A protein has these predicted regions:
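Hydrophobic alpha-helical transmembrane bundles of multi-pass membrane proteins
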Residues: 8-414
Length: 414
């Protein structure tokens, strides 16, 4: 008969296998939820742009996801984590294929970068140059900062910990994903210029109201629901999952909605972007904050979006169609800072965070994004061009690029 210690060891591989399988399922569900968020990006843009650009919004988001998958699989994931997929399927499927679903999950984050940018450059950007920009951004620019923040690349995180007592903390990507996406979008929008006819010679703003409020609302709701996978599943293993993340996400969402409702004066566009502003901001500290801190974070984010969207469009004449710079860029940066404020034990948080480290990490993300955005879009504008010509823009991207509109006037019978 085998000794007791030997018998006790027999179930262990089975238990480990079960744990790996559970973690795979957990992360896979998160990846699917965040993948579904890309439908939200598509419908949010579709409902906001004019009718002649609706098809382009749908096609652009899906195409950008495909390009992102290729860029991240072959280049980006290696840049960020030093890992690659040039091994046998037998090796890749170890631990029930956990590393594979982790890649899938992180890919859905990476693909959010061009989805964010898409909303800012809508209605006048050329299709193929944007696909090239997507490949470069997801293959090189985004994973460069992702690796710094989430894989300790280049030694910034150890230095922050040694200097300030804590690393830069971004649990689910307020800065790594949203601020980076929003701050890349800003130079893209500036280099493209405003839509023709948006601003008149006498300084007035020509109104371009949303073409379809129901689709805009649908997009916002899809994003909101998927966000709970974005945040909660960022734990990446079942043993680290926390209900605090879910509740904080909820409270920030509510805070953003209420602030946008009041300051936006019941405007449906503001109200449906309000919860997104709150959720963008809470990503970084959702695992640290007290729910009241998360509520305040969301309230500030909702107000920040409404005020800065109005300023950029009306006073600064920056034609950011969906307001992705204030929504993702500014609210994401606020979220990185808020994690250092409301994550502190003095304000009911879990602690283990430094405001100085949060400020430095957030600023670092902004610098990388601005530099990468100007480099990529500046090179493309100087070489192949990034903007539709006046006639194409007048006709609309749907007819110009895709040869069909969202609602054709007549059918062709063969």
């Amino acid at each position: 008969m085998a000794p007791a210690w030997c018998l006790a060891s027999f179930p262990e591989p089975k238990m480990e296998q079960t744990n790996h399988a559970s973690n795979v399922l957990f992360v896979l569900l998160g990846a699917i939820m965040v993948l579904a968020m890309h439908a939200g990006f598509a419908f949010l843009e579709l409902g906001t742009v004019r009718k002649k650009n609706q098809v382009n919004a749908l096609v652009k988001i899906l195409t950008d996801f495909g390009v992102s998958a290729l860029a991240y699989f072959f280049i980006g994931y290696t840049v960020a984590y030093g890992a690659h997929f040039f091994a046998s399927a037998e090796v890749l499927s170890q631990k029930s294929g956990y590393e594979m679903v982790k890649f899938f999950f992180l890919l859905t984050f990476a693909a959010a970068i061009p989805a964010i940018i898409s909303g800012g450059i809508a209605e006048r950007a050329r299709f193929h140059p944007q696909s090239i920009a997507t490949f470069l951004l997801v293959g090189f620019v985004y994973p460069f900062f992702e690796g710094i923040a989430w894989n300790d690349n280049l030694g910034l995180q150890p230095w922050l910990e040694a200097t300030f007592g804590a690393k830069f903390h971004d649990f689910a990507g307020s800065v790594v994903v949203h601020a980076v996406g929003g701050w890349i979008a800003l130079p893209a929008v500036l280099l493209l210029g405003a839509r023709r006819g948006r601003y008149t010679k006498d300084g007035n703003v020509a109104a371009h109201p949303p073409s379809n409020i129901p689709f805009l609302a649908l997009g916002a709701w899809i994003l909101t629901v998927g966000w709970f996978g974005f945040n909660v599943m960022s734990a990446q293993t079942l043993d680290k999952v926390s209900g605090l993340v879910a509740l904080n996400s909820l409270m920030a969402m509510v805070g953003g909605t209420m602030a946008a409702m009041v300051l936006g004066k019941n405007d449906p566009g503001f109200i449906h972007n309000g919860p997104l502003a709150g959720l963008v901001a809470v990503c970084a500290g959702s695992d640290l904050m007290h729910p009241i801190g998360a509520l305040i974070t969301g309230l500030v984010a909702g107000g920040l979006f409404v005020q800065l969207f109005t300023l950029t469009q009306n006073r600064w004449k920056i034609d950011d169609v969906l307001g992705v710079w204030p929504l993702h860029g500014l609210c994401g940066a606020w979220g990185g800072i808020a994690a250092g404020i409301f994550g502190a034990k003095a304000l009911g948080g879990m602690g283990g965070v430094s405001l100085a480290a949060q400020l430095i990490g957030t600023l670092g993300g902004i610098v990388v994004a601005l530099a990468g955005g100007y480099l990529v879009y500046g090179l493309l504008r100087a070489t192949i061009g990034i903007r539709l010509d006046p006639e194409e823009e007048y006709e609309g991207a749907d007819l110009t690029i895709h040869k069909i509109t969202a609602t054709p006037d007549r059918e062709t019978h063969w």
